[in-house]
Amino acid sequence: MRRLLALLLLWSTNSMADQPVLRFSVAESWSMPLVRIEDDQPVEGLLHDLMQAVAREVGVRPEFHVMARLRLEEAMSSGDIDVRCYVSTQWLNDRPRDFVWSIPLIHQRDVLVGRAGDSTPIPPERLPPQAIGTVLGYTYSTLQPLLDHGQLHREDSRSQLLVLQKLQAGRYRHAVSNQLSLQWFNQGLPAEQQLQALAVLDEQDLGCMVRNDPAIPTQGLLRALVRMKQSGQIERIVRRYGGTGDPDSMSVARPEIPSKMPAHSQRN
């Protein structure tokens, strides 16, 4: 029996070694429910499960490259990664010509978040001059006019989790978060301590970009993502980590810049 188990283990190890490798990028700014990173490798989370699932679909071995978000486009251009997931066309300065887009896979909302008990909806242009919690390297197109005019001032953290933790601790009065991360952060808190979504700032359909290279199964991977989306597998992964689709009916805020704007922002 032991010999049989040893042979099965050896066969499994050799089979994995024979599989082609596909290099997936992982942004170090991601936190749960997107991904949890241990020893510079993702070990669980929505995107970890999605990337593992699509790798199984096409019979490749995933290799995860954790890097700063600001390095992702450089890594794509230099050929250091094969697949980048959880990305929007709005986030790229220049689209790498040798990458192909998948179909939209996940719908994301960015929301303005207030402290516990601060549940009154407020459009961002009505915020008084203040620092606002943001993630280092992330762009917030809806808020950019307010940042440019000095009404708001970025208070950057390295991850979305740190942004929400600092808001909870009172470092600032408002922050920006994607809806999934906010729901995950709140799920273990009593209702009176939960952070509040005050306005939807933006919505994006996110997908994956795959290197168009004959050395990797580009079209097979794109077709696998289509099958996973059509079968409901991706939605099941999202729900596994607390995603509820469309949690409320708040409309997307489009700030109007007042004619007179304070010249400088002020910190809390």
Residue ranges and their predicted role:
Residues 61-64, 138-154, 158, 226-268:
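Ligand-binding clefts/hinges and TM-proximal coupling segments of bilobed small-molecule sensing domains
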Residues 63-74, 155-165, 169:
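Short helix-initiation/N-cap motifs at beta->coil->alpha
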Residues 60, 77-86, 168-177, 181:
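Alpha-to-beta junction loops
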Residues 45-57, 117-121, 125-131, 137-138, ...:
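Extended ligand-binding regions for polar small-molecule ligands
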Residues 52, 64-127, 136, 140, ...:
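Acidic, polar ligand-binding/catalytic clefts
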Residues 37, 51-60, 101-103, 124-128, ...:
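Ligand-binding cleft/hinge of the Venus flytrap
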Residues 28-30, 106-111, 187-226, 244-264:
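Periplasmic-binding protein-like
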Residues 19-46:
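Short glycine-rich His-centered loop
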